[in-house]
Amino acid sequence: MKKHALVTILLFSLICQTAFSAGIDTLKKNGYTLIVSGNDEHFDNAIKEKLISTFFIVYPKIVKEYNKKSLKQVVFFIDTAYHGVAATDNGRVVFSPAYMTKHPNDIDVVTHEVMHITQDYGSFDGPGWLTEGIADYVRNEHGVANDAAKWRLPDYKSTQNYDNAYRITARFLVWVETKVKKGTVKKLDSMMRDHTYTDSTWTKLTGKTVQELWKSYSENPAI
């Protein structure tokens, strides 16, 4: 974890320590509002504080970098009925208390999920693998506790493909950014949001199809 991020999380947790209750917590900072509630009365308050702190660290940065029109108010709900990791819809993020209790250091689940809010692709039927790949790309760039969670982009393997989504796609995107054309990810994100993304988008942005890019990546995947 980056030292300044850790200090910020600890300070924010201390400041807000007495503000959390079993009901609904509404927190405001620098123009952003986070509303936190849930149905698990036994959920670890320390984990909840970290989730909240991470939101106020990463969300404003992501909004500024990717979509300045993104929501200023977000809802977190800790839901015992949800058995995945986390899910986002319409500015509301649902977290699994079972998962977070078992993986208390994986607080950058927040970073991934709030990027989905920032993406705001709406009803666009774009490729889901790219949506998730961009979200993990942003987690890799802006996550505050990836090391603590032992979360990292996987090394390339011949069994992988660009459309495997999540971290595999994210690593490919890092390679495109660093080895092919800087700014590609932001343009892909913007075109997904504007509903102008097509299969030919890769050629327009980089001069190569996504399949050609993947072939080059597979031959020299160092990032």
Mark where each language-model region is.
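Surface-exposed patches in mature extracellular/periplasmic domains of secreted proteins
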Residues: 63-79, 122-128, 147-154, 173, ...
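Solvent-exposed, polar/charged alpha-helical surfaces in well-ordered, non-transmembrane soluble domains
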Residues: 53-56, 60, 108, 136, ...
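Bacterial Sec-dependent N-terminal signal peptides
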Residues: 1-23
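Juxtacatalytic substrate-recognition/specificity segment
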Residues: 22-114, 198
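Soluble non-cytosolic domains of exported or imported proteins
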Residues: 45-56, 100-109, 125, 129, ...
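Post-HExxH zinc-binding segment in Zn-dependent metallohydrolases
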Residues: 58, 126-169
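Pan-zinc metallopeptidase signature
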Residues: 24, 176-223
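Active-site recognition of the HExxH zinc-binding catalytic motif
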Residues: 108-120, 132-136
